[in-house]
């Protein structure tokens, strides 16, 4: 671990990726090849197509590669102040319902997602929040039944929730109080 810390310390802040240096990081995650699981990625695409993204926000479609990004954040010398995860979750609600979660509230069925390295992504989110001081939230959408085989595209209910989630994101993370930007904030 000390060797990793030494390698990270030799980088200047300008060498770090944007997602480490911006005050707010928004990650859309999921697998677009498994129906509603692609919700987070679709929200990122929708926001990029319909809204200007403030300079203080890094908006990424992380797909199924979220684990590597979270490891990088945990080990980095610079981190965002806030991290929002956009994800599809089965929490027993109505399909297409949008709701907010703290990392500690992630349903047990999600704890083993992307478990290639046997360390659940939710543990990394808690580590970022509790040890690294990053404010972490999850904006989730209740999925319909996920396909057992490859099936690209969201269900009607979840597809209808994409603009609603995008509006929530813009209102809560692109606003003047969340990330002051000259192009979004009126002059005082």
Regions from the language model: what does each represent?
Residues 1-134, 138-143, 152-164, 170-188:
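N-terminal catalytic or cofactor-binding beta/alpha core of small enzyme domains
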């Amino acid at each position: 671990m000390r060797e990793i810390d030494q390698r990270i310390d030799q980088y200047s802040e300008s060498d770090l990726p944007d997602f480490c240096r911006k005050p707010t990081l928004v990650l859309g995650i999921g697998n677009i090849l498994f129906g509603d699981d692609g919700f987070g990625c679709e929200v990122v695409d929708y926001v990029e197509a319909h809204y200007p993204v403030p300079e203080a926000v890094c908006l990424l479609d992380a797909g199924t590669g979220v684990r590597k990004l979270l490891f990088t954040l945990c080990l980095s010398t610079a981190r965002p102040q806030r991290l929002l995860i956009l994800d599809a979750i089965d929490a027993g609600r109505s399909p297409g319902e949008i709701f907010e979660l703290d990392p500690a509230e992630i349903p047990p069925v999600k704890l083993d997602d992307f478990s290639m390295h046997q360390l659940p992504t939710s543990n990394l989110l808690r580590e970022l929040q509790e040890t690294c001081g990053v404010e972490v939230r999850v904006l989730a959408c209740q999925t319909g039944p996920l396909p057992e085989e490859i099936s690209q595209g969201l269900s009607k209910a979840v597809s209808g929730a994409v603009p609603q989630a995008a509006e929530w994101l813009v209102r809560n993370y692109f606003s003047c109080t969340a990330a002051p930007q000259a192009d979004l904030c009126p002059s005082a």
